[in-house]
A protein has these predicted regions:
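TRNA-recognition modules of translation machinery and tRNA-sensing kinases, especially anticodon-binding
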Residues: 1-257
């Protein structure tokens, strides 16, 4: 039997962060430099947090079992980072009302939806929710912060567009699209051959959501966005299939050291 010297020094393989972690930390740094607080929130939430506090009525299709993972105890896996909005509004609302300190916070995390996977959809994905509430906040403030963030992430001006979109917790609501950097806007499977990739649902926080969070919508307005970190990572690193990110392929991850 061959003898082995287990005390002999060996070369240690260097680890690396997952590219979603890299993108998340970069976004956190950017928003932090603009005065946003970074918050964490549970992946298991209540029906109230995920739906009722966000102006989503009982009959809304987002509550359908085919979209949301429900647990036996009545709680659920959060289907969007917006589930933290109510808690954030209540946490920072006192400072806004008593001291005039704007509410500015981001809260990244995993989201879960019971849906089929393809090149641009997964049942587990990462988002970064952001909110800002103060007097006289408008859509122009939302556009400014999102354009600033994207320019910092990609180190150049990025072509974006706003499309009208319906989300019960914002009014008006929009879809923020980014020109597909994988195909240069010409069309590919990742962007469904449209030249655009949906990146971020956003809009002005609905008065009912502000009111539920203890904020008077007659005095204050605010915006919210749900930035898709997974898709942002795809765009930044030129990944054509979202499923690669959760594949556990060490060879693929090593290139992002």
């Amino acid at each position: 039997m061959p003898q082995f010297d287990i005390t002999s020094p060996v070369a240690l393989a260097r680890g690396s962060y997952h590219l979603i972690t890299l993108v998340q930390r970069e976004c956190e740094k950017i928003f932090s430099s603009m005065g946003f607080n970074i918050e964490d929130y549970s992946e298991i939430v209540t029906d109230y947090e995920c739906f009722e506090a966000l102006n989503i009525p009982k009959h809304h299709p987002a509550r359908d079992m085919q979209d949301t993972y429900y647990l036996d105890n009545g709680q659920l896996l959060k289907s969007h980072t917006s589930a933290a909005q109510n808690a954030i509004l209540k946490k920072y609302g006192k400072g806004l009302i008593e001291n005039g300190t704007p509410i500015k916070a981001i809260f990244p995390g995993r989201c879960f939806r019971n849906e089929a996977t393809d090149a641009c959809h997964e049942n587990t994905f990462f988002q970064m929710e952001g909110v800002m509430v103060d007097k006289d906040i408008s859509i122009s403030n939302l556009i400014y912060f999102m354009k600033t963030m994207l320019s910092e992430v990609f180190k150049k001006d990025i072509k974006v567009r706003l499309r009208p979109g319906f989300f019960p917790f914002v009014e008006p609501g929009f879809e923020l699209d980014i020109s597909c950097l994988i195909c240069g806007g010409e069309g590919c499977p990742s962007c469904k051959h449209s030249g655009w990739l949906e990146l971020c649902p956003c809009g002005m926080i609905h008065p009912n959501v502000l009111r539920e969070g203890g904020i008077d919508p007659e005095k204050y307005t605010g915006f919210a966005f749900g930035l898709g970190l997974t898709r942002l990572a795809m765009m930044k690193y030129g990944i054509k299939d979202i499923r690669v990110l959760n594949s556990g392929n060490i060879k693929a991850l090593k290139q992002f050291k």
